[in-house]
Each structure stands twice: as structure tokens, then as C-alpha cells.
Regions:
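Bacterial N-terminal signal peptides
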Residues: 7-16
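Bacterial N-terminal signal peptides that target proteins for export
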Residues: 1-7
Length: 341
């Protein structure tokens, strides 16, 4: 419950943002005329991107054209909880958090912008914004951490891209639905240099169903947005047949500058994605570290981090320890000991 003020603050920031220009929302919605799925690849924890996503989700011109909002930040094994929650059911905070915490991404989804998507879909349905109920589809691998004790146990769930593509196949495409798919930018790229390591979610969907997916990534650099003639934020451009189609995809990466030369074999924007979105920079939002003061949760995070380290070499154990320490420091400042008389 300690994190609630931070989540509320995040929602106030989202609500106070400048409304999205009508053409950006309308132009993205128009892609549903010819595609079943619009995928937006976000930069994790980006306040600007999620401000735009919230505005788009609450705009009937877009959200009422989709049947589903599918998200990377949710465990597909817990789909029944998502269905209950977004239909107005009463779930405990533990049940709600389990949907995004019970994944193989140990920390990122604690950022309030992700929970906000869950709450927005619930609110859309409660207010009957659309003639039909919008379903929240949890797209990530059906991992059960209670049955994972070693790296070998985790390996079957390592290919998250295929897992998300399979979920989209089962829950959206096979049902002839239209959907918004929200993932990290990595998963939205249709052409990469590392296909030997496995296909991205967008690549798999595109190969199974050519033309079904319209993928979008954001341009975080204001300098790149200016060079690409994006116009004031938020602004959107489709790649095919436009002035950005044959421009280096490197311009969509954080930190791009006008003096940066393109890589010798860099792909073009039109080769990698179908459109780009500029939302006015990229500032990150983080949850209160006090959420890690729950000793049971912190212990379980350390256990999961050790298993992930054994499988991938990525080490989150020290990060968890640092977050717990930071949480204690904040707690001490917020609750100083009484001054003796």
C-alpha cells in the first residue's frame, strides 16, 4: 500500500499532460482499416509514451475500434484474473499485482504506468465508453514461479517473443479481432541483425500473417524528430511511401544526434517498422523503492534474480539489494524516530 501515493502521482501527471493532437490518434486508428493489430513499441518507463497511450486508450475513435488491448507486461497464465478485473470484479491488491509481477521481468513492470493500463481498461468498461467490452490480454509467457527452482526450469519460458506471438495468434487473430499490442520497442521490430538468436514478436506475427500487423516505434530524440520533420508532439508518420521510408532506423534510437553517422549496414525505418511516433522526449518514471520493504517480496525477488542470473548472466540481485536499502532510507526520512524529551 506504500506505493499508492506514487501511483496516484503518476496518474496526475498523465492526466495533466497536453491532450494528444487529433491527427496522431486518428492516423493511428486509421491503420486498423487494413491491419488486425497495431503494435506500439515503447521505451520502458517512459512517461511521455504512456501519457500518449492513456490518451489514445480513452479516445473512442481509437479504442472502440479494437476488441483487445494486449500487453507484454502481463502473465498469460493469469488471463482469468485480467478478465475478472477489467469486467469490474473485486480483486485483492496481491492478485492485481501478480498479473504483472509474475513474469520473467523482475522489476520494470512495478513502474505505475503499467498498472495504469490495467486500470484504464477497467475504467473504459465500467463507463461503457464503447458499445462492446474491451478485453485486456496478458501476452507474456505462462510462467509459474512457484514451479521454477533452477535455470533449467525457467528455460522453457525464455522465448518471450514467441510466447507473445502465440498469445496474439490464440486470443486475437484466430478470433478475427482487432487489437492494440503494447510491448517494448525491441519486440516491435520486423527486421534485425540477430535473427539467429530468434525472431521478435513482430517478425513472427508478420511471417505467420503477412500484412496483419502495423508496428510503430517512438522517436525519443527531439533532434531526430526535427530532422524527420515530425512536427509538434504528438505526431505520427507512416513509413511506406513517405519521406522517412528510406531513412536510417538509427534515428529512432535514444541519444541520436545530427552529427552521428549511420552504421554501414543499418536498416531503414521502412524495413524495420511501419510507422514512427514522436511524443516529445523521454523521461523515465520509477516506483517508490518502499514497495521492496515487504520482506517476503524482496526474498522472492532475490530468488528469481539468482535463477535469471544462472540462465542469462544478467544480475539483478545487487539491484534488489540497492532498492531495499533505498526504500529503508526513504522510510526513515518519512517516519523519523520521536525526539526524546
Amino acid at each position: 500500500m506504500r506505493a499508492a501515493p506514487f501511483a496516484a502521482a503518476a496518474m496526475l501527471l498523465l492526466a495533466a499532460a497536453v491532450p494528444a493532437r487529433a491527427d496522431a490518434v486518428a492516423d493511428i486508428a486509421r491503420q486498423l482499416d487494413t491491419h488486425s493489430v497495431v503494435q506500439i513499441g515503447e521505451l520502458h518507463r517512459s512517461l511521455q509514451i504512456h501519457t500518449f497511450l492513456q490518451q489514445m486508450l480513452r479516445d473512442p475513435r481509437f479504442v472502440c475500434r479494437v476488441d483487445d488491448v494486449a500487453v507484454e507486461f502481463g502473465n498469460s497464465r493469469l488471463q482469468k484474473l485480467a478478465d475478472a478485473y477489467t469486467s469490474g470484479g473485486a480483486l485483492s491488491e496481491t492478485q492485481i499485482a501478480s498479473m504483472y509481477r509474475e513474469t520473467s521481468v523482475p522489476l520494470t513492470w512495478n513502474t505505475p504506468v503499467y498498472r495504469a493500463v490495467y486500470d484504464t481498461v477497467r475504467d473504459i468498461n465500467a463507463k461503457h465508453l464503447c458499445p462492446h467490452r474491451v478485453r485486456l490480454v496478458l501476452a507474456d509467457a505462462p510462467l509459474d514461479w512457484s514451479k521454477v527452482g533452477t535455470a533449467k526450469d525457467l528455460e522453457p519460458f525464455a522465448d518471450r517473443d514467441t510466447a507473445m506471438a502465440d498469445t496474439m495468434e490464440r486470443e486475437v487473430i484466430a478470433r478475427h479481432h482487432h487489437a492494440l499490442l503494447i510491448t517494448g520497442e525491441f519486440h516491435a521490430e520486423k527486421k534485425t541483425n540477430d535473427e539467429a538468436d530468434g525472431l521478435r514478436t513482430a517478425q513472427t506475427i508478420e511471417r505467420r500473417h503477412p500484412g496483419a500487423l502495423f508496428s510503430i516505434v517512438t522517436v525519443p530524440s527531439p533532434a531526430a524528430a526535427e530532422a524527420l520533420h515530425m512536427g509538434p508532439a504528438p505526431s505520427f508518420k507512416a513509413a511506406r511511401g513517405s519521406d522517412i521510408e528510406h531513412v536510417s532506423f538509427a534515428m529512432t534510437k535514444p541519444g541520436w544526434t545530427a552529427s552521428q553517422p549511420p552504421a554501414p549496414k543499418s536498416f531503414t525505418i521502412g524495413e524495420v517498422v511501419d510507422g514512427i511516433l514522436y511524443v516529445g522526449g523521454d523521461s523515465s518514471l520509477f516506483p517508490s523503492p518502499q514497495i521492496y520493504l515487504d520482506p517476503v517480496y524482496a526474498k522472492e525477488l532475490r530468488r528469481r534474480a539468482a535463477i535469471i542470473r544462472a540462465m542469462t548472466g544478467q544480475d539483478f540481485v545487487a539491484v534488489v539489494d540497492d532498492l531495499v536499502k533505498e526504500g529503508r532510507d526513504q522510510d526513515a526520512l518519512a517516519n523519523p524516530p520521536p525526539v526524546p524529551h
